[in-house]
Swiss-Prot record:
Single biological process term from Gene Ontology: ceramide transport
Organism the protein comes from: Bos taurus
Function statement: Accelerates the intermembrane transfer of various glycolipids. Catalyzes the transfer of various glycosphingolipids between membranes but does not catalyze the transfer of phospholipids. May be involved in the intracellular translocation of glucosylceramides.
Family per record: Belongs to the GLTP family.
SUPFAM superfamilies registered for this protein in UniProt: Glycolipid transfer protein, GLTP
Protein name: Glycolipid transfer protein
PANTHER family membership: GLYCOLIPID TRANSFER PROTEIN (PTHR10219:SF97), GLYCOLIPID TRANSFER PROTEIN-RELATED (PTHR10219)
GO MF entries: ceramide 1-phosphate binding; ceramide 1-phosphate transfer activity; glycolipid binding; lipid binding; lipid transfer activity
Gene Ontology CC entries for this record: cytosol
Superkingdom to which the source organism belongs: Eukaryota
Length: 209
């Protein structure tokens, strides 16, 4: 769990404004999460998350004051790009980033909730499938869906996944899951607010890749 516990997201302020700098710093440590899943087929999600973080940071770095919060980014780009928005810039990058982050959230929450295949309780295929279907599947075309279905069957045993997540530390499964639950508190709240922001600003796009 060391992988997640070292970089907790900040608690949300009362106004639910997410500061861009600290957010990008925290999520920039998440791509190695996909290495814990073992299969190289998860590499595209890892690369997508890394690439979108880089795109958002490039915009943020041009004017950290103007782009202080994630909402600032959407508001400024909406005015800047006009009819092209939200299909451009950091707005588009954050739209895809939140989906990758949601995959991680649903996957970890499903494991913490004890959801499993009773016939194969040490497999995490059920958890990974739920996360993919909730976060990413509807944005993927048929070919990409087939690739990920293959990846889900290559997912590691839960015990091996939790060991990788703990960076080999000698901790019990319950200790690891307790730290995952702690990580999920601010992480889930933050992702929920980003989704709400996209809905409120009518910035969500449903095209497939």
């Amino acid at each position: 769990m060391a992988l997640l516990a070292e970089h907790l997201l900040r608690p949300l302020p009362a106004d639910k404004q997410i500061e861009t700098g600290p957010f990008l710093e925290a999520v920039s440590h998440l791509p190695p999460f996909f290495d814990c899943l073992g299969s190289p087929v998860f590499t595209p999600i890892k690369a997508d998350i890394s690439g979108n973080i880089t795109k958002i940071k490039a915009v943020y770095d041009t004017n950290p004051t103007k782009f202080r919060t994630l909402q600032n980014i959407l508001e400024v780009e909406k005015e800047m790009y006009g009819a092209e928005w939200p299909k451009v810039g950091a707005t588009l990058a954050l739209m895809w980033l939140k989906r990758g982050l949601r995959f991680i959230q649903v996957f970890l929450q499903s494991i913490c909730d004890g959801e499993r295949d009773e016939n194969h309780p040490n497999l995490i295929r059920v958890n990974a499938t739920k996360a993919y279907e909730m976060a990413l599947k509807k944005y993927h075309g048929w070919i990409v869906q087939k690739i990920f279905q293959a990846a889900l069957y290559a997912a590691p045993y839960k015990s091996d996944f939790l060991k990788a997540l703990s960076k080999g530390q000698n901790v019990t499964e319950e200790e690891c899951l307790e730290k995952v639950r702690l990580f999920l508190v601010n992480y889930t709240a933050t992702i929920d607010v980003i989704y709400e922001m996209y809905t409120r600003m009518n910035a969500e796009l449903n095209y497939k890749v």
